[in-house]
Amino acid sequence: MTIKREMRNDKRAVPKAPINENISAREVRLIGADGEQVGIVSIDEALRIADEAKLDLVEISADAVPPVCKVMDYGKHLFEKKKQANEAKKNQKQIQIKEIKFRPGTEDGDYQVKLRNLVRFLTDGDKAKISLRFRGREMAHQELGMELLKRVEADLAEYGTVEQHPKMEGRQLMMVIAPKKKK
């Protein structure tokens, strides 16, 4: 006994256009195999032309009146479309936001390490979110936090630009720096 398995839903699949006998229109605007426009012909005539060329009749635009069909190799057409979709996906880069946390009393050694990480994030093309958390009585000296963020902004001026200026959110001071565009 064989078990019928359902085909998985492939997100990369190109939507299939009606071809050959599956085209429901009576007459179509035909484009030949070499790209020249043949004109408006009956579906039987278009199928005969495609059959003579040993190619498929593919419906390109169903919304047009009459629908536009082209004589082409459908398998090759699907392959090219899938290839283009993969290329577009490969060339896409997703920008992430990386966060570094400071404190008002961050010492110079720790500051340098965190600054190196921020430089690495920005050169990799990611945005950097700098958060400075105040505890207890430190809230009374928010100007120390502002000075620290101004120092960070000055040190990172050659690597990025401030996208969101320092802003208080509860007990945290936040700032977002975006990488500079590469030429």
From Swiss-Prot:
Q: Does the keyword Metal-binding apply?
A: no
Q: What is the disulfide pattern of this chain?
A: none
Q: Which UniProt keywords apply?
A: Cytoplasm, Initiation factor, Protein biosynthesis
An example GO CC term for this entry is: cytosol
Give the domain of life. Bacteria
Q: What is its main location?
A: cytoplasm
Q: Could you give a GO molecular-function term held by this entry?
A: translation initiation factor activity
Looking up Pfam families in the UniProt record yields: IF3_C (PF00707), IF3_N (PF05198)
Q: In which compartments does the protein localize?
A: Cytoplasm
| SUPFAM superfamilies the UniProt entry points to | Translation initiation factor IF3, C-terminal domain, Translation initiation factor IF3, N-terminal domain
Its assembly, as annotated, is: Monomer.
Q: Which family does it belong to?
A: Belongs to the IF-3 family.
- Alphabetized HAMAP family for the sequence: IF_3 (MF_00080)
Tell me, in a sentence or two, what this protein's role is. IF-3 binds to the 30S ribosomal subunit and shifts the equilibrium between 70S ribosomes and their 50S and 30S subunits in favor of the free subunits, thus enhancing the availability of 30S subunits on which protein synthesis initiation begins.
Q: What is this protein called?
A: Translation initiation factor IF-3
Encoding gene (name): infC
